[in-house]
Amino acid sequence: MTTASPRRALDLVFSPAPPPARAGGIGLTVLRIVAGLLWLAHVWWKVPPDFGEARRTGLWFWTHLAVDHPVFPPYSWLVEHLVLPNFTPFGWLVLVVETLLPVLLLTGTAVRLAALIGIGQSLAIGMSVAQAPNEWPWAYAMMLGIHLVLLLAPSAQYAAVDAVRAARIGGDPAPVARRLLGGWGVILALIAILAAVKSLGDELLAPRGSGVGYPPLQLFLGDYNMLAAM
């Protein structure tokens, strides 16, 4: 028993055989959740109603980079002549799409649809900013690769609404649903506890509550006053 675990660990790393299905499923689930958190970090600075157009900041600034530093000239032409003249509707569309993406990925709902949307968004962002100063084009290639994996590989076997939907086809979905709801209950309870602790001493209905997350890694889970935490 004492040698089995190290041997299995070595086999997992060095064996040419595929990893166990469970390990692969868990790894893909982690990749899906990380992708969801990535999109969640993209949402907070897309601020309506003008999305930075008046001050030439925010989404307007990053969108205009497609014109200032073209990656694919036909795309830059579309941005200049179609997107920028209709920027407010475009901003709302981006906000809706990039709010929907993390919701679908983090909850594991319609993951393949989310992956397709993620591929489209990754392409659009990459063609807008990949040639801008201080940008790293390979970051957008990795975003495309991540969503391609999520499209083609089973990344919704665990911690996913899609797993409940799949269980309905093969049998009883209740155990899978209970595990999913229990996991989300624990996560939401932890967020509520953190928000309540950070809001101690604030007014119950403070207009802007304390943020929950880790700013150095651009991980934001929302702002909560004491009432919202409760």
What positions do the PLM features span?
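Extended, low-polarity transmembrane helix blocks
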Residues: 2-96, 107-230
